[in-house]
């Protein structure tokens, strides 16, 4: 009798080219996404050694990190950023790789355009020189970030040397209450397991609450797997997955589609499959979540308070809390709802999709941002922007006092003009709240799109379940 396998086991086995005595393995890579920041040296390595891209049709390039989200007809002011963008265009043209430049309507954040185009498929191995490649695991793909030297290796060979990770399952049962989103669920998971909880593992997300999520919500959860320490995150594909992918530009068509779906239906963990680690959460008991510190595990409920240094169980944790409080300009015992904000950022590969913008616009309709708050909405792609404008969401945002921007990574990270000033506090829908992540001495609180929008109007964090 065949040994029961996890979803991760199945995808790994299907892509295993060779297994070495030292435990390392050579995996075949189905899809490779590249952007302007981590690919220049990789392409230059190919050039210097006289190599070509082995499978150009399995590689897709896009600019996202460095591009401005304001008027692009003026170009990119920063020399290094401009050079990286120009070099990606040169490399894509020279090596025959499809490329979405900053003026292409399909351009956007790399982890949003992959699924949009049907480039992301269930059961595929997907890599990108970006840690949030785990996003694509929402489709039942084994997806993770790689370094620049590995980018070169994949370009040249369409393979990657890997060591197999352990299996971890996070089961989220119950139905979340109104106002509790996928972002709250994943922040609660990270708060439970910590930023090292998934280290050495690939996480499979399962349970009633996960199955109930839309594909956009599932992408939000898988996106932040890396913040939980995991190499990748997975959700078994189902009819929602297939409906999302059907008729996408790069999805299989006709008979090939039917055959693909038949195979994709086998991509689930078998009954009795072994998981090295398992965690359970009840979504029904979750309130909206806000991070208070400088790590994604520093979470609090909206009706909670900032932790006190003396509440920590270890000296190391006390030191960590004290440092975070000092950086964030907060005091232990301060109510989360008493924390005022200066900026709102709605966007990123975590929460820059159409569903996210709809959730924020629903909160903002007929309201206006607080006088002391500056807000920006950055669609995750040109296609998201087009659809949002077709639905009139841009009008809602503008009338509420928000800036409506062009697609890109934007204020998720301080690699472009969108950044916080020292001491500014931001309600952000992105994925990392590290020191300086959004700008030198900037203070980041991670929240859902609806929570960010409401905070912008109130000028401080509020419980959207009761706030009007």
From Swiss-Prot:
Keywords: 4Fe-4S, Amino-acid biosynthesis, Branched-chain amino acid biosynthesis, Iron, Iron-sulfur, Leucine biosynthesis, Lyase, Metal-binding
Cofactor dependence: [4Fe-4S] cluster
Name of the protein in its database record: 3-isopropylmalate dehydratase large subunit
Subunit field text: Heterodimer of LeuC and LeuD.
Catalysis: reaction(s): (2R,3S)-3-isopropylmalate = (2S)-2-isopropylmalate
GO molecular function: 3-isopropylmalate dehydratase activity; 4 iron, 4 sulfur cluster binding; metal ion binding
The EC number(s) this enzyme carries: 4.2.1.33
Enzyme class per UniProt: lyase
Binding-site residues, [4Fe-4S] cluster: 349, 409, 412
Pathway(s) this gene product operates in, as recorded in its UniProt entry: Amino-acid biosynthesis; L-leucine biosynthesis; L-leucine from 3-methyl-2-oxobutanoate: step 2/4
Similarity field: Belongs to the aconitase/IPM isomerase family. LeuC type 1 subfamily.
